[in-house]
Amino acid sequence: DKYDIRNKLVSHKTGELFFRAHEAVQNAHISEFDRQGHFIIDYILTELNKDRTLLLFISKNLAWGVFKGAFEEKMPDDEYNFYQSYLDMLAQSGLHYKNPELMLFTIIELVGSTCYSCILYQQPVSLAEYRPYLHRTISGIMETFLQDHTTCEVLSSDTKTHVDHTA
């Protein structure tokens, strides 16, 4: 049906965008996982800022299931798979993240929901003005998902207590 076709097209276009971002990060010879992630996000935002029609098309029809389909879709050489490349980058980093799929979902949802208005309407600020805040927030998300960081201090009125954030 037409929704199936639309979802496949969104998935394909999104997959192409991530494929080009992955090629660009490889060509930039960036090896640290967090820097790779920030580079890929910047690449995608720059491309969407240049092609607002693509942004409108993708964002109007994008749900996590469609997005995940884009990750699993094979790209031009039939060997590239974004989600597998993401997992490979994680493995090569030597860092251990708890629930890497949830971390990716959280970052994608943040970027998608906050950057749309910045790109299309420059609201509440332009994308250029927003980027530093976005990147600090993404770094915080990555820090939160690090395997070794499952507790944090919470200050109560009189004492310090630890809150366990393990799922």
Spans of model-derived segments:
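Intrinsic-disorder-associated, low-complexity terminal segments enriched in Asp/Asn/His/Tyr and depleted
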Residues: 164-165
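Hydrophobic alpha-helical connector segments
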Residues: 8, 12-15, 22-51, 104-107
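Amphipathic alpha-helical packing segments from all-alpha helical-bundle domains
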Residues: 15-19, 53, 66-94, 101-105, ...
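Alpha-helical DNA-contacting segments of helix-turn-helix folds
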Residues: 4-16, 20, 58, 78
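Hydrophobic/aromatic-rich alpha-helical bundle segments in the mid-to-C-terminal region
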Residues: 90-138, 145-156
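Amphipathic alpha-helical segments used for helix-helix packing
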Residues: 47-69, 116-117
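Regular secondary-structure segments
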Residues: 18, 22, 45, 112-119
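Alpha-helical elements of Rossmann-like donor-binding domains used by nucleotide-donor carbohydrate transfer enzymes
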Residues: 39, 43, 85, 133-137
